[in-house]
Amino acid sequence: MLPRPIFSRPAWAFAAVFMVAASLPSVSLAAGMSPAQIAAEQRRAGPDIIESSLTTRLDVASRAALITNVDSGEVLYSKNVHQRLPIASITKLMTAMVVLDAKQPMNELVTITEGDIDHLRHTHSRLTVGTKLPRADLLLLALMSSENRAASALIRNYPGGLNAGIAAMNRKARSLGMPNTRFFDGTGLHGENVSTPGELTKMVQAAYRYPDIRAFSTAPDYTVTVRGQEQHFRNTNGLVKKPEWEIDISKTGFINEAGRCLVMMAHIRDMPVVIVLMDSWGKYTRIGDANRVKDWLEVAINSR
């Protein structure tokens, strides 16, 4: 059995203030406004693109986006923030939370079975049927490398079985104030796993409370032994290896219906921010958008 992974940068080294608000309107909107008044203000601001008092303009290619200051709750930028979209493997953050909530032994061996094979999209996996790995390793691979069979095995082995695990995911979403979020599986391969940028921001902030999710989702790589052979896995978000980025939590996602998605909590010039990018097309668009957000915030913070 492999030991629990230890990473050079302790993910718990950063303090955070969680402000999971009931909603995420721009700070330019007055508190207590009716939905109709808020919609009118948003129309005047443009096509559901709202920016804070930051003076420079940001343009992202992603279909929907939300950038939030964690400490203050300020919405720094939003685009189509209320649009309900498929979330692909961003789902795995919720899978991880309910698995950890269940407090099952993390060193317990879990077996990959025929039931974990992806017959919907026929995605490839190096975790062959019969592979046995500690629950901790499966959780790491699901978060770091977006390993679908790992996520499937985790939720299938949830107390009470698969249906109980998916029900727990939906209950957790409701408890976090995410009424527009729905889960039908634990991998994100199901096209009807949906959410909004605002609700994914809440999910990222909730996931940050779990040290294992912080550590595993930002691990650059990890090696496991599968049937006597070493298999090396890498993080699906290459930014975690970039020294100019200080990323506290990360998850990527992709299916055709969702496009390419990316959620992160990061420190930019010592400001903790949640970055949600949904429905990016092109292999590098979400990474380009994330770098544009970082550059924009650095300029804006320096000019304050």
Language-model-derived ranges and their functions:
Residues 1-64, 295, 299-304:
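N-terminal secretory targeting signals
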Residues 31-198, 202-211, 268-269:
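Active-site-adjacent loops and short helices of periplasmic peptidoglycan-processing enzymes
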Residues 178-182, 188-304:
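Domain-terminus/edge residues, biased toward the C-terminal soluble/receptor-binding domains
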